[in-house]
Amino acid sequence: MGLVVKGISFGYERNKELFKDIDFELNKSEILAILGRNGIGKTTFLKCLMGINKYNKGEIFVDGHKVSNLQEHGKTAYVAQNNKINFPYTFLDMVLMGRARDIGIFSLPSKKDKKDAMKALEQMGIAHLHNKICTQASGGQLQLMYLARALVQKPEILILDEPESFLDLKNQSEILKLIVKLAKKEKICCIINTHNPANAMKAADKVLLIGKDSNHNYGKTKEVLTEESISTYFNINAKIIDLESYGISQYTMVEI
């Protein structure tokens, strides 16, 4: 079992909903990509799942148990977009903060905590940067560090808000590959917000296209992301290209 969301609706004002009746199911090891136009409510929806914003109606179930939000579940890691760091913490310091819930307010990190933090950095391929000062790091390095901090929490559910934003194409590809690897290896339910349908095609098992009112489209990636749906939801003309003829088990899109 995994995560089930039923009928989630939200609005900042009464009788004026930003989105309504969002449903999806996500099994362990699966990745769900959430897409939609700017301002449609993708980030707000993630905040509703996390309990940062309070949804107006709907239900959330984790492994068959109803929860009011995913923070209540306790085994969910959330990586927000555009995280800014104004203090000279090292990468290791930041990843250890992911252990705060288990360490306690007045306790110091144990040897095991530090070992787990270094292991998470190693899984992200940045163990050699453990003493790197965050204010001196690149956007790609910081994104990997935040993933390590999420991973050290040993989450069952991982929520990432535009993890590939502000990265060049190579780093976008590397981040997405790591997310896929983590979801499969650690059996994590993973949700990513993205603006790019091609990135969803590359990484996601399922897609949720958020539209106005209840005009949402949810299902397997290849069934949901079609030339017609991309035109409808993004107002662009696109060509879907299957890469199997090139020996690659993947497909992508180009705008035309």
Write out the residue ranges for each language-model feature.
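Helix-to-loop junction immediately C-terminal to a conserved catalytic motif
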Residues: 50
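Conserved ABC ATPase "signature" region
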Residues: 96, 111-129
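The feature captures the beta-strand-to-loop junction immediately N-terminal to the Walker
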Residues: 35-37
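A short, flexible loop at the N-terminus of ABC-type nucleotide-binding domains that lies
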Residues: 1-5, 9-21, 28, 54, ...
